[in-house]
Regions:
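N-terminal secretory signal peptides that target proteins for export/translocation
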Residues: 1-39
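Proteins with a high burden of low-complexity, intrinsically disordered sequence enriched in S/T/G/P/A and R
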Residues: 8, 41-44, 96, 187-189
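Polar low-complexity intrinsically disordered regions enriched in Ser/Thr and small residues
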Residues: 9-12, 31, 52, 157, ...
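Positively charged, low-complexity intrinsically disordered regions
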Residues: 13-14, 28, 45, 112, ...
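Bacterial N-terminal signal peptides
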Residues: 36, 42-53
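N-terminal targeting leaders of exported, membrane, and organelle-targeted proteins
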Residues: 55-57
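Cell wall/extracellular polymer interaction/catalysis modules
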Residues: 59-211, 219-259
Length: 259
């Protein structure tokens, strides 16, 4: 025995491999329990957030239904769902107003409504034109192709105003992939037009038609444009748009905002 090493240090305790395993298991259990608590908290937070979002969406549906009972419930639900989807993706989070167009209604009838969600008021209930190549009184041909002179559907985000060939107009960004992404390139804008004449529509059997723009009466063009400009939404319902109410299926893209 090498005495230079001195007597064993009794203050230094050793543990067996088995005891080390037990201690490690205990620490693992504590860590696992902590992870479970953290995960459960995150799940609960996400669940609460989802519940609040659903509640807000339901509130808007109920509000619009009361303010504009002429709009079919399914169309309202579709429009609000598409709007909320865009907002969850960071577009129009401060939007206060939503316009809904139902292109399954004849052009001779009022088929465009503008609702102020914050003030809880119906601002407009009006006629709106569809593209000349989309159909006679009700659009049956829909296109997002440049030069098609057809109406495009889906969710639009309003931008700035300008004065062009049709007077005071409002730029629109198409947010619905496969439906209206070419809106900026097609120069699809909101403007007033003399051919949007409800009285003439009675004798003609249809309202005057546009080159694809959601044109309105000249008399109400400016106030309606001012009500919607700068970060609000317009939703155009028609054939096939029900799919746009499903957020998360990549039916909506924000890429067109860079156009």
């Amino acid at each position: 025995m090498d005495k230079s090493l001195g007597p064993p240090d009794k203050s230094r305790r050793t543990t067996s491999p088995m005891l080390d395993m037990v201690n490690t298991a205990k620490r693992g259990s504590v860590l696992l329990a902590t992870l479970k608590i953290t995960t459960n908290c995150k799940i609960r937070v996400l669940a609460i957030g989802a519940a609040l979002a659903f509640s807000a969406q339901a509130d808007d549906v109920v509000l619009i239904s009361k303010l504009a009972p002429e709009i079919r419930p399914a169309v309202i639900e579709e429009a609000v769902a598409a709007m909320k989807c865009a907002q969850r993706r960071g577009v129009g989070v401060d939007a206060r107003r939503l316009a809904i167009i139902d292109y399954t209604i004849p052009s001779r009838e009022q088929r465009r409504w503008v609702v102020d969600l914050e003030a809880q008021k119906l601002l407009f209930e009006e006629h709106v034109a569809h593209g000349e190549k989309s159909g006679f009184d009700i659009p049956t041909e829909i296109s997002d192709l440049n030069g098609s002179h057809q109406t495009s559907l889906g969710l639009f985000y309003t931008d700035a105003t300008y004065h062009g060939g049709n007077g005071y107009s409002l730029k629109l960004h198409g947010l619905s992939e496969g439906f209206n992404q070419s809106a900026m390139r097609r120069l699809i804008v909101m403007h007033g037009a003399a051919y949007v004449d409800p009285q003439a529509a009675v004798s003609m059997g249809r309202l005057g038609r546009s080159l694809g723009c959601p044109a309105v009466r000249v008399e109400i063009a400016r106030p309606m444009i001012d009500a919607l400009k700068g970060g609000n939404f317009i939703y155009s319902h028609g054939p096939g748009t029900a799919a746009l109410s499903r957020c998360g299926d990549e039916s909506m893209t924000l890429a067109s905002l860079a156009d």
